[in-house]
Amino acid sequence: MASFSPLLAMALAIFIFSSHSNAQLSSTFYSTTCPNVSAIVRTVVQQALQNDARIGGSLIRLHFHDCFVDGCDGSLLLDNNGTTIVSEKDALPNTNSTRGFDVVDNIKTAVENACPGVVSCVDILALASESSVSLAGGPSWNVLLGRRDRRTANQGGANTSLPSPFENLTNLTQKFTNVGLNVNDLVALSGAHTFGRAQCRTFSPRLFNFSNTGNPDPTLNTTYLATLQQICPQGGSGFTVTNLDPTTPDTFDNNYFSNLQTNRGLLQSDQELFSTSGAPTIAIVNNFSANQTAFFESFVQSMINMGNISPLTGSNGEIRSNCRRPN
């Protein structure tokens, strides 16, 4: 009889634990302890949108940037404390870039007033993402809940694990693979760039000196290029923002994919999905451009997939009373 190696036993244990953790997430997790949590979150997001049209894109980005670093655990929300917490907020992909933390605080306050000590900060991010999408005209879905908050942050992981707007398709695909997501997830989740804004510094190299060639990115539509060069002139502020989707900037629809087909993807990482020769992403972009329902269905599933990345459940982690610091 073949021996059962310790390494195989460990791998099996990890698989069982991982599967068990994901299985513990449920859309009815708070049905008795905080039955109105979804409505509470939606109300605060709706209020925030009245003053800040771009907040929906900002909130979903927080969820994305949280999940890609050690899993969906709310670690991105932790502030520096001068000793044990070196905040992910100060990692290169996040500093002077991620926003919406005040809205998360407002949601947490409202939820704590209704159900003290029950709902995790990471679950608030997941619920706020769904509210942001549906309030912008996108799909609604039953968010799986039951994650708990990590007590530590991983700034180094944020610097290495998060996809960059300057990366090619090979690197983007690898970073998604690293967290258990596939090419369809990559394209579907990139579709969140159908709303929100981006800073000039995230795409200005495409406008004047792409890959140190001294010329603009040849995949950029020339009319769109001229518009972007006016918004982000050489020597201008890198923190000026413009719409990720120039056609319907605050609506969650499939125009993002139509933009890629006409070389109007704002970020290099956007246009790579369509302009990389022979890439499997091209057919997915074409499908989502032609069929908004297909995009919405894939997006919902990919959001669920992303939300399932290594959650802390059971007795692991904690339910923070303040999203900015461990209890």
Swiss-Prot record:
Main localization category: secreted
Cofactor dependence: Ca(2+); heme b
The protein's Enzyme Commission number: 1.11.1.7
Signal sequence region: 1-23
Catalytic EC class: oxidoreductase
Residues the record lists as binding Ca(2+) 1: D66, V69, G71, D73, S75
GO cellular component: extracellular region
Reported pH dependence: Optimum pH is 5.5. Retains more than 50% of activity between pH 4 and 7.
Example GO BP: response to oxidative stress
Disulfide cysteine pairs (residue numbers): C34-C115, C67-C72, C121-C323, C200-C232
Keyword annotations from UniProtKB, A to Z: Calcium, Disulfide bond, Glycoprotein, Heme, Hydrogen peroxide, Iron, Metal-binding, Oxidoreductase, Peroxidase, Pyrrolidone carboxylic acid, Secreted, Signal
Catalyzed reaction equations: 2 a phenolic donor + H2O2 = 2 a phenolic radical donor + 2 H2O
Modification sites for Pyrrolidone carboxylic acid: Q24
Ranges in a coiled coil: none
Subcellular location as annotated: Secreted
SUPFAM superfamilies named among the record's database cross-references: Heme-dependent peroxidases
Chain positions carrying an annotated carbohydrate: N36, N81, N96, N159, N168, N171, N209, N221, N287, N291
Gene3D superfamilies the record matches: 1.10.520.10, Peroxidase, domain 2 (1.10.420.10)
Job description of the protein: Removal of H(2)O(2), oxidation of toxic reductants, biosynthesis and degradation of lignin, suberization, auxin catabolism, response to environmental stresses such as wounding, pathogen attack and oxidative stress. These functions might be dependent on each isozyme/isoform in each plant tissue.
Family affiliation: Belongs to the peroxidase family. Classical plant (class III) peroxidase subfamily.
Name the record gives this protein: Peroxidase 15
Upper lineage: Eukaryota, Viridiplantae, Streptophyta, Embryophyta, Tracheophyta
